[in-house]
Amino acid sequence: MNYKGKAHKVGEHIDTDAIIPARFLVTTDAQKLGENCMSGLEPSWASRVAPGDIMVAGRNFGCGSSREHAPIAILGAGMPVVIGHSFARIFYRNAFNMGLLLMEVGDEVDKISDGDALEIDASTGAIRNLTTGAEITCPPLPASMAAILAKGGLVGYVKERLAQV
């Protein structure tokens, strides 16, 4: 899986309430959630995102309440990948289950600035900053996680597996 897009940096300890505030949890429609992605920090944030852009986060991204709406909102905003210093564990699992790729890179995240053009090869874990030339390597995903992502998330993966039984 390859991705190319503009970086949208967000801060540290961004919780799921900032990603998608509770007042928007009345739907699971990805487009509607995407229109309100990050509105807990800035109401018009999602309007700057183009399809294929990449979110870049600091430490402990996705902390707080466990809600599948948060990764759905990110996907609905058009961002298929979040590169981060670190992720809250429950958000990490929810993201993959919903089909959102997370790449945990530690302090290497500092090699990316807001607006940088990025290119990602998820199969190898290679992240290239096309703006600066910096290269970041993230461990490749385990085969089981890559298989879930390839089916758009856990529901698609399970449906396919059940069809084979």
From Swiss-Prot:
Pfam families: Aconitase_C. Keywords: Amino-acid biosynthesis, Branched-chain amino acid biosynthesis, Leucine biosynthesis, Lyase. It catalyses: (2R,3S)-3-isopropylmalate = (2S)-2-isopropylmalate. The keyword Nucleotide-binding does not apply. GO terms for molecular function: 3-isopropylmalate dehydratase activity. Pathway: Amino-acid biosynthesis; L-leucine biosynthesis; L-leucine from 3-methyl-2-oxobutanoate: step 2/4. One of its GO terms (biological process) is L-leucine biosynthetic process. Its EC number is 4.2.1.33. Belongs to the LeuD family. LeuD type 2 subfamily. Heterodimer of LeuC and LeuD. Catalyzes the isomerization between 2-isopropylmalate and 3-isopropylmalate, via the formation of 2-isopropylmaleate. This is 3-isopropylmalate dehydratase small subunit. The gene is leuD.
